[in-house]
Amino acid sequence: MELVSVVVPVYKVEQYLERCVKSICEQTYQELEIILVNDGSPDRCGEMCEELAQKDKRIQVLHKQNGGLSDARNAGVKLATGKYLLFVDSDDYIVKNLVEKAVAEAEKMACDMVLFDYYCVENGIEEVRTTQIPGGKVISLEKEHQLLLAPPAAWAKLFNREFYVKADCPFPKGLYFEDLATTPIFFLKAERISYLKEPLYYYIIRENSIMTGKNHEKSSHDKMEVLDHILSVYRENGKYETYREELEYLVLANAYFEPSKELVLEGDDGTYLQKYRDYTKSRIGNVKNNKYINQWSRKDKLHLWILNYKQYWLMRLLSKARRMVSTKL
């Protein structure tokens, strides 16, 4: 059996850490190297990591000064020795046979990366997040351009560690959206990718998590820096025109559509809405005929119309109506 290195960044997750590590230790695939990276957590997380390591010899603990999620992941990768590499966030947990299924797929297809679906859990409600790419065969970005539209989460992928190291794409320290900053680069460099159309990971959305409590000034700055980096890498590699439609969609979705919806519902006075609007206009041309936008649901097309014509009151009204209906049900 091939060794799999599982990197788990740990910071202020006392309530969730044991559940996370237990789900890894109890995998049906047992050839694991579990690396817990205590990122200077001010609570008992460091002690808990040591206690967990005493119970399972496959666990090793790295204590370091706080440097953020990206820095913790990068530090864990440096310690990894397995053929394969998996990231698990410490407030999440994984399906019992995730590693077994992902490794079997990687070995069968000789892949650089294996993608899989996941459960998004918010307020106890589970929703499967999937993507529209073919499964059961070897693919690449060159063959499947819409890979660029797949969820960027690093934890929804198993990496061949040799490929990961050669790609030389560490997570950017100090920035939000570290997965968005790196995944499109991995897709560009990977020659063999496979996709398991099955949810194997539980992603937990918490009210006080990094992203739900994000600062809008830093969030907008980091989002734009990350997207500019992606566009720059594709241009440097002579691939911008090849993937123009996907890259323009990536900018529209990440720097305009999604953050603008959030800001409207939060009652933003227009400062950050205009910031995202100006950025998007400066980076992409006319996307009205973008094939991916044309595939949107009527609801998303309506939301885009609302944003384009600044009819924010209508989006707030629709959101309020949905909440009222949901409460009655």
Can you annotate each of these PLM segments?
Residues 69, 90-194, 204-218:
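Donor-binding/catalytic cores of nucleotide-activated saccharide
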Residues 265-329:
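Membrane-interface aromatic/basic loop that binds lipid-linked glycans or pyrophosphate carriers
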Residues 38-48, 65:
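A conserved acidic beta->alpha catalytic loop
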Residues 64-80:
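Glycine-rich, basic loop-to-helix element that forms the pyrophosphate-binding segment
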Residues 200-206, 213-239, 258-288:
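Catalytic core of nucleotide-sugar-dependent glycosyltransferases
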Residues 2-5, 23, 33, 181:
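Cell-envelope/extracellular polymer assembly enzymes that use nucleotide-activated donors
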Residues 12-26:
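Short, well-formed alpha-helical segments that are part of the catalytic scaffolds
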Residues 85:
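Short aromatic/hydrophobic "clamp" motif used to bind/position activated sugar donors
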